Amino acid sequence: MITRVLVANRGEIARRVFASCRRLGIETVAVHSDADAGLPFVAEADVAVRLPGNAPSETYLRGELIIAAAKRTGADAIHPGYGFLSENADFARDVEAAGLIWIGPAPESIDAMGSKIEAKAAMEAAGVPILTVSDPVGPGDFPVLIKASAGGGGRGMRIVRRAEDLDAERAIAEAEAVSAFGDGTVFVEPYVERSRHVEVQVVGDGRGDVLVFGERDCTVQRRHQKVIEEAPAASVPADVAAALHEAARKAAASISYRGAGTVEFLYDPDALSEGSPGGVPPGAFFFLEMNTRLQVEHPVTELVHGVDLVELQLAVAEGRGLESPASGVNGHAIEVRLYAEDETWTPQSGRLITLDIRADAAFGPLARAGIRVDSGFESGNEVGTHYDAMLAKVISWAPTRQQAIRQLVTALRRARIHGVVTNRDHLIEILSTADFGADEVTTTWLESADLPAAVPDVRLAA
């Protein structure tokens, strides 16, 4: 049995893991940089260990310091959260070599999915649909998308529409990939013009059994980075959703996946009108990648399925079996990421004088329709420049999608946020569009969307 968990992370995700551990009677250990010493996650842990310095390379990316902290504080397991070392197979191996429990997939699974080129080959062998293009790229293959094999988040990614631009764009993508990931390997695949981003949550026991907890729609993106996530994917027909779930299950089972993971797909709604009735046509969806960790957007799945994904991670890490969920989808959940950033999406820093978002729950389930807020900050905290600028995830859960949207807009309008500029108004504008309300968006929709001006809450203006 796990008795004490060190979370090799910071902020909101550390608090999220601590919340499940407290409920289960498991003690917790935080590691923190100097800049993070005053943040809530440090105070909430049973034990806190300083990692001298501020830059990630000095602190949260120093695997040897984190393992030493776990040994020194008597932790018997390490949870990586997301980002930092969460998908570093060598760190996972080092954790296990130190005699500690790694709350995550086997290092071999991380390796298998770490390279997009190798992952696509493995998924094709498992019978999961993938995007392919001829090599070399022919005149009839355009438009195409150049992608970094080792990365994500839009870095090392270029859309090419003309053959004469291919070499130059490939060189730019390779340079971006080297800068961001230390690996300039890129590959080319067809570019789907009107696509949606749909992902499936899986939890595996490491022995081939895999539970599927439905799909999430992460189509609203900015520069290939997710802005809004929701579950279930309302625009996906039931037969396509079932096919996505089965493809994700096969993907995870093929690598004997252990723990929580997400299989991401590109969904092409236009392919449905071109296919024949009576089944899901070829080309309806394609494998993109598998994230071998807990996702930022996991709360929407937890709310509609009534499940604690961190608890399941802990259960699998302890070697316990998985039980099928008692119920299916209940209602609709939508999550927005509240960032300290200006209208040009430039990260902001400074003292967060006030952060007051009315919530019915934090880091856990909702008893009824309402708002959940998962945040790494509180009023009075300092927002620094060393890490991601996300202040909070604001999640709405309701019986219907329209009610969830209304609740979320109201919560954002009524939120009191002072001291740093945020994207709060931008989020309200997106949620208030007719396109979003009708669920008629694509992965590039936000680039040209006609956004209405955010309407302030009159009670706050008075």
Question: Which ranges hold each PLM region?
Answer:
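N-terminal beta-alpha lobe that positions the nucleotide/phosphoryl donor
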Residues: M1-V263, Y267-N291, Q295
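Catalytic cores of soluble metabolic enzymes centered on carboxylation/carboxyl-transfer
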Residues: P299-E302, V307-A462
